[in-house]
Regions:
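Enriched for short, Lys/Arg-rich terminal
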Residues: 2, 8-25, 29, 42, ...
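A short, surface-exposed loop/turn module that caps and links secondary-structure elements
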Residues: 32-59
């Protein structure tokens, strides 16, 4: 599988790299797991509904979520800061 980023998601990740290295490490670990097993594993993966149908979410913390979409051989990151956009 390959990993790609929406512009806003990449900016979210850059924010963590600049402000909270531990959070960035946690996100990296979740990303690796998303590439191996996109719909199971840590962070309580759950399919999203309504406007985000087709996307999945994993908990980074109580406040922040990793939101991504699996399409074929690609995992596209939509957000990694706050809740659902």
């Amino acid at each position: 599988m390959t990993l790609s980023w929406d512009t806003a998601a990449w900016e979210d990740f850059q924010y963590w790299l600049d402000t909270d290295k531990a959070m960035a490490r946690k996100i990296r670990a979740l990303l690796k797991e998303c590439l191996r097993t996109p719909t199971t594993g840590t962070g309580k993966p759950e399919p999203l509904k309504h406007d985000f149908a087709g996307y999945w979410s994993r908990r980074i913390t109580d406040e922040h979520r990793l939101v991504y979409k699996v399409a074929g051989d690609e995992v596209r990151i939509a957000a990694c800061r706050y809740h659902y956009g």
